[in-house]
């Protein structure tokens, strides 16, 4: 019921025609049953903001955190995409990395990312730190969540993120396997083939007022839940 022909997405890149590809797919996948298979249903997030600790005897703690995100077809998705880049989606150039890693030395890496699922979208992040410092790292993340929701981003941050996202995009297409993976992802998300031509324009079209309005709507500090695995010191479940 999960693996059915009507639910397949196939992309082929290289010196091959549809006529040549068809028989190969028939041989490889022809025995799969017909039909649409199981469909996901919308999920209501039952978990509330707070902290869950999973005890594990390790020298450092790893935390995953997040709350509800945004649909891929939402009009504000690209504003959310740029916002996440500024918050924690650009490695050491992000706000969280500047505050948690560079200024305080609490971690080697902290990041955030948009998780796009058909019926369960999330804005998530992760960080790892020593058991006696993970509490401080979490406090800084929460503070930056509140700060960005309240104050938004600057014009310079927006421009820098747009330049990075649009400039790095062509580098994803440097091999057949990568291109095929991108095309399958586009199919799964219901995007047209023209998306590749319009994606950068839509990123550059995000305005400061739009992204700051969205920051206040999307970022919900009170809903942020942390799951910490390790033996963190000074933290209690909420």
Identify the function of each model-found stretch.
Residues 14-19, 130-134, 231-233:
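Helix N-cap motif at beta-to-alpha junctions
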Residues 17, 37-49, 103, 117, ...:
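Acidic/histidine-enriched alpha-helical segments
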Residues 9-12, 127, 159-238:
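C-terminal regions of mature proteins
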Residues 78-81:
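PPIase-associated folding chaperone regions across multiple families
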Residues 1-5, 27, 31-74, 88-136, ...:
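Non-catalytic beta-strand/loop surface segments
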Residues 22-28, 137-144, 238:
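Short amphipathic alpha-helices in soluble, non-transmembrane regions
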Residues 20-21, 33, 73-76, 236:
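Short helix/loop capping segments that flank catalytic or ligand/cofactor-binding pockets
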């Amino acid at each position: 019921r999960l693996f059915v022909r009507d639910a397949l997405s196939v992309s082929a890149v290289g010196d091959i025609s549809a006529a040549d590809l068809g028989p190969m797919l028939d041989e490889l996948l022809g025995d799969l049953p017909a039909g649409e298979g199981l469909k996901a249903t919308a999920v209501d997030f039952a978990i509330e903001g707070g902290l869950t600790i999973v005890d594990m005897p390790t020298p450092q703690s790893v935390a995953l955190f997040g709350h509800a995100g945004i649909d891929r077809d939402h009009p504000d998705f690209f504003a959310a995409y740029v916002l996440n880049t500024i918050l924690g989606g650009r490695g050491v150039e992000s706000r969280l990395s500047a505050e948690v890693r560079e200024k305080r030395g609490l971690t080697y890496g902290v990041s955030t990312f948009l998780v796009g699922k058909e019926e369960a979208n999330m804005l998530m992040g992760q960080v790892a730190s020593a058991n006696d410092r993970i509490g401080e790292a979490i406090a800084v993340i929460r503070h930056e969540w509140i700060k960005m929701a309240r104050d938004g981003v600057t014009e310079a941050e927006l421009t820098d993120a747009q330049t990075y996202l649009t400039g790095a995009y062509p580098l994803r297409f440097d091999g057949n396997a990568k291109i095929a993976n991108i095309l399958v992802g586009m199919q799964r998300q219901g995007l047209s083939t023209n998306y590749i031509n319009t994606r950068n324009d839509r990123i550059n079209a995000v305005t400061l007022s739009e992204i700051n309005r969205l920051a206040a709507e999307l970022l919900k500090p009170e809903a942020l839940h942390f799951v910490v695995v390790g033996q963190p010191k000074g933290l209690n479940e909420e």
